[in-house]
Structure formats: structure tokens, C-alpha cells
């Protein structure tokens, strides 16, 4: 059998002693029922007793103090653990705290002769620093020693409880003792390596432990001996001293108290002092708040040990230190004492504004959601730097939590107790939240080495049932229980009294019955049900995948927030659930698959500016935030590669980030508000959506079109689900073999559309004289599009163009110069929008024109033009006026003084009339466009060219070949 560490014994024994020690039970009854009326607020100057176990403070009168001392003495004699302090008041006894560094690992002898000499030297300084009262007085000295040497460190206390001194007098005595050569010689003879600096200067006023009490996770000091010194003012040179006999017959808690005035052995001796100069010490609430936290919070004890594993750079270097502070603050607001303790590990920084910086960071943590790191990161850092020590601490933490339940409930374990330990074991790996249907849903953070689907690594995987927890309870949890059995059997092997041994026998018997339950299916299901409440993280589902700059990829998480993109293939705290199976690899134009795809893009889109614009546009599909309000309409008669390209984008991004959309979403009337629309819900959270395979002459629903393209919130719902609000974030492409019909003159709709017409056709036997006919390669459709190497390469191309768009155009598609698409879009609009055709053909911008047209004149001119060139029809003037106000003429329309709309700075042309100097057509000119002539390629690497109207690409001697 092995004995657990003292720290484990400390926390477990506190629980156990309440069961088998009647004295401890009586003490708790006294504190909770009778002395509770004397409770004080933390920090109160009335306080004289502090209970470190509960953090409660008391102002006890002398009679109640004696009762408390009696109970504490009985508990001490039974070996109970206690954590009581007394506050040194205005006048109280003297305590000297010696912290020794030894030359060896052996405890110093500290025999009575040496201690007697030390008493004499201390009394000399007392006489010199205070005014002793007249008459004969007995002054008692007690020496309490640290139980053992720890790594060459030792200590002892000198208690002089009867001599009542002011704090300033104590400080004076301590100050002079620090420089006493005789005292230093005595200590040096005892093997002390630091005799000149071993006396703690702060012992004059800090709260002092009552005898038998200790600091958390430390053994109490033990009484070595006591001396009685007699001083008579009539004969000050004769100072006899002798060792106290039968010292254990007294109530030592009472006799060694610095504030007690009613001892049987020790009587108070008051020394005169300047009372006006005295200032009562403050009760150091912060000094013991960490101890209280660790007593009551097992996780805090656990984190304290984990933080101790972090190397110095984590509390010296600001970025790492701030991460630790954020992690503690985001884990629990109660962990401020841990943050302060950790920060004080670097005294230089703490003493130069460290406390103020901590205060600021702690307050910022709740506001800065972008830095939402928690204790999970602390665990990762500790495991990274000290894996073996981390493993030992983690295992010990599980043991302590389980042991507390075993000892508190006499060996009987129920579902919640097991769930609590499982939460400590797996709380960093599993999360539970409630979905929109009110059901508890499990999520598991997937790590390397466990079974998974491609792409799940380093992400939160949704679990129907946490099967790993079921297995873990039976196979791993049993090992923790075996340690409890070992711990109980160890105590049974010790020479305890009969009542204590009987307690451990009953405990072991009950615990063995509980152990077998972890192999029972129904019991484990009960544990899992209770675990749902512990693992619950509210709104966790709502936080998943909310960062638009993060994409789950096959080999981790890709961050596109910075340039270049960063692959996160290690532990992180980003709540990512969705993913694509594609692995991210940096763009490499020399990669054979990348070369193949770059050449294919060159064939599919022969115009360089259009090719670059379309790739920039498609690259925005990897970003799921708000985008520019655009939609690409791609016209092609078939066998031109547009479908291959659109499907490849969708396959690369996967179903979580991309979706093929039903064309009826664009062509049908909008459903009523109360009806579901699953097709529309396919756009929720997607970065990419595409339409294809339309019938001839499909008419687009312009109101739906604007809703889908405009950035902002929309509402819809799935079948049998509640209405949801979400943002439109998809990059959308609509492909067709026929032109869409867009029956609107609204400029707000048209300015959101871009149109491109395919020129190339892939044929079995291409005409060698036709540069727009290319040799078809069925492998692109049947093999390459499914090949992971091809998909990985294309994903790297998308990321490359995304980075290029951010660096060179500030992420704005509209800044990319593309005369081909601009002119084709203009031509397409003219074919659909007769009002726009009229404006661009008959109205010119003329800054020097003096003529001002009433809007009614423009309406008349359009009606005449329409009847002459399109078809004879009856026009409604009011409708035409509204259409003109929403057209491209909007910026030229002004209000006249009589509140009518006028057209200014323009001129309406008559038939066959030409432009005058300084005039220009409104809209994009299609004269001499590149509709039928491909731009020649720049030499070598087309993807490196940046479209710029003032810097045309360097041209090759001839048009590109397939």
C-alpha cells in the first residue's frame, strides 16, 4: 500500500474526520449554531478570529474565545486538521517567525540550552524597545517547530504570548534582533545557512495561526519546549530562566494564543507604548483568499498545480501572461486570486504596476470575445511543457474529487457523484448544449489518434450518444476507484483507535459495492444523464462557426483573417464544428495538379481580365461574412466548362460551406410568411451557392433576387421548425444555357448583377482554325473533380486569389478592373431593360449643356423612342417617372425650386445626332469591347497579373493555345 501525498490527506481527512471524530462534530456545531451571532464582515477591524476553512470571520468576546479554545484543544489532541487564525490586536503577544535555510537536509537540533540562550537575547531587545512595568513578572517563551525539512528549508516560531506589546514595539524588537550578532551565532551553530536574514519582518502584525492549526496543505508546527523567565524591576540584572515542566497538561491552544488574557499558565504583562502612534493592522483578505478558494473549490486546487507547471516565460513575457489571465477570467470570475498569485511569481513586474495591469486585463476579458480562451488552453500549455508532471497532477485531481464523495457519503456513490468526476476528467473534451428542439446535444473535441471521419480533427463533433464516455466509465474510471480502495486499506493498516478502524472497515465495504455499478448499463446511462447538466455550456451551439474568417479543413482549421492564411493544426479554442474534407496546402504553381487547373482555367475563360475577376469572385466563397452585393450570371451553350468550375468550387468547400440551389428559388413567387422554405434555408451559413440547368427564358423574381444578394438579415424556416433569422453570406453564381429574363428597370437590382458569356466550347474534334474550340478531356468531369489531389490544389488556388484580393484590392471585388465583364453586363442589361437602353443610347452627360429637362419631358422622349423602336403601347407617366428616378439617371436628377424633378447636366439626343465635344454616354460603353477578342496573356504566370486600367498586361506575340 502507498500513502497519498500530504495534500491529498489534507483535503480527504477534512471530510473523513467529520465522520469519526466527535470533537470535530462538536466544534462545527459550536461555530454554526452558537458563534454565528458573532460573525463579522471580511476586513472588519472588530475581527479577532478567522476560520480559513470557511472564510468566515468572528469578533468573539473573551468568554466565547475560551469556549472555542477548549474545543480546538480537544480537536488538536485527536489529530484533527484545523485552520484557525487570530488577529493581533492593538496589544498582543509577540510572535517571531524564523524561516531557515540549512546547510544539510537534517533538522537542526535546537536543544534547550541553545533555546535558553536565544530567550535571553530576545529579552534583552524587549527591554531595550519597551517599558516593562514595575514589579516581578513571569514571561513565557514557547518554541514551535516545523515538522520536517523540505528541500533544505526549515522553520520555527518563538511565541511570547503573555507580553502584550504594540505593533510598533514589535517591529522595533524584530528590527534590532535581525542585526544581533549573538543570535546569528547561535543559529549558525545550529547549521543555519542564512542567520542574518531568516527572521520574517512581517510577523509583527499579520494574523497568527492558533496552535494546532496550519496553512492549507501544510502540517502544523509542533511544540518543542517552553521556558519561564522571571524579571524583577528591583533587580534587573538577575533574570533566572527555567524550562516549563508538564507543559502538555495545559490547554496549549489557549496558553499559546497571542491575544488570550485568561490563561492558567500565561498571565498578561502590559508594556507601555505611544498609543497615539499605533495603527491597527488591516486584515489581509487577499492573502488568504487563495487558500479559501482552494479549500472549497477542487478545480481551483487542480488549476493551481497546473499553473505551477508553466515555465517562467508565462509570467514574465506580457503576451503569454495576458493569455493566462484571460484564460482564468473566462473560466470563472472566482479565479481572480489564482491570477494574482500567478502574476506575483514575477515580483519585478508585479511591483511595477503589475496589479493595475491585472485589473485592466481581468475587466477586459468579459468584453473581448475574440480572445475567448479558457482553462483548456492552460491545460494544453502545461501538458506541452511538462507532460509527465501534468499526467500525475491530472490523475491526482480525479482521485481527490472522488475521495471527497466517498468519505462524505460513507462509500456510497450515486449517478451525480460519478458524473462530477467524469466532468473533471473529460470536461475539456466534451460539451453539452440544448438545441432548438429542446434536446440535449453532445459535442466532442476530436483529437489525433481517435476514430474520425476525414475533416473532424481539431473540431467539435456532434455526438448522438457519447459512446466514448460510456467506454471510459467502465475501462478508465475503474483505475481511479482502485486508488480509493488502496487509500482506505492504507488507513486500515495504520495503528488507529478502534472506532476509527471500524469506520474505515464500513467505508471499504460500502465502497466495494459501489465500484461494481460502473459496469452496469442502466447505471452508466444515469451517469450520462446527470453529466448533461455538468457539461452544459449555454449558447455553445450559437457560438459554433460564427467567425467568418475560420474554415474547418481536412487537416485542421484555416484562418484567413491574416495574410497569408494560417493553418491551425494543433490545440485551439475556436468553436468550429463545420468543415470541408479538403486539406489545406499552400499555393504552389509548380504542383502538377495546380498546373493542370491553372491551364484549365485559361481554357475555360480565355479573357484574362474576366478570368481573374471570376477567380477573385469565387475566392470570396471561403469567407462567410457579409460581402459586396453581387451575383454572377454565367451564360453558356453547353460544353464550355462553367458547370465543371462551379461544381468544383462546391465540392471543395463541402456541404457545410456550399450548396447547390434550386432554380425555382429565383424564379418562383415568394412563399407566404407562415410557410417553410427549405431551399432558402440552404443558404444559411453558406459561403457559396450556385444555380444551374435552367429552362429556356426563365424569368427571375427580382424581389427574391434583391433579398438574396443584399447583405443583411433574412428570415425563413425549415419544415416543422421555427422561423429563423440569418445573414446572407453566400457568393452566388447562376449558370444557364439561356439568358435569364429580368423584367425590371430598377438600377438598384441591375447594379448588383454581373454577366459573363462563355466563348469556348470543348469538342471531340475541335476546329484547328477556331481558337475558341478546345479538345475535350472527359477526365475532368469523371476523374479529376473527384480526386483529392485535384480538390486540394483547387482549394489552394481559391485561397491564393483570396489573399491577392485582400492585398491588392482591400478585399473589394468592385475595385477589380474588368472591361470584359463590365461591357458584357452592360450589353445584357440593354437587352433586358429598354429604359436603360434608351438612357445609354439617347441621353448623354453634357456638363456644359444649358438645357434643363423636366422629368415629364424625359418620360415623353422615352415613350416616343419606345413606340418607334420597340413596340407601340400605352405608357403610364407616373410609373415611368418612378422608374426613371430608380434608374442610372438618379444621380443626375435634382429638385427644382417649385418642387419638381429636373434632369440637369445631360442632353437628350435626337435620332442620328452625335456627341459634341466634352460629352459622353451614360453607362459602360460597348463600342469596341472585348466581346469577341480574347486579351492576350501576360508572359508566363497569368495568375500573378493584377488588372489595372493604367497598366495593361505585357502581351505575347500571339493568342494562347490550348
Curated annotation (Swiss-Prot):
* Keywords for this protein: ATP-binding, DNA replication, Helicase, Hydrolase, Late protein, Nucleotide-binding
Ranges for the SF3 helicase domain?
607-775
Xref: InterPro entries:
AEP_C962R (IPR056443), Helicase_SF3_DNA-vir (IPR014015), P-loop_NTPase (IPR027417), Phage/plasmid_primase_P4_C (IPR014818), PriCT_2 (IPR014819), Viral_Helicase-Primase_Cplx (IPR051620)
Q: Name one GO molecular function term.
A: ATP binding
Which protein are we looking at?
Putative primase C962R
Q: What is its EC number?
A: 3.6.4.-
Which PROSITE patterns does the UniProt entry name for this protein? SF3_HELICASE_1
The UniProt entry's sequence similarity note says: Belongs to the asfivirus helicase C962R family.
Q: Does the keyword Glycoprotein apply?
A: no
Superkingdom of the organism of origin: Viruses
* Up-regulation conditions: Expressed in the late phase of the viral replicative cycle.
EC class of the enzyme, as a word: hydrolase
Q: Does the keyword ATP-binding apply?
A: yes
- Where does this protein hold ATP? 636-643
An annotated GO BP: DNA replication
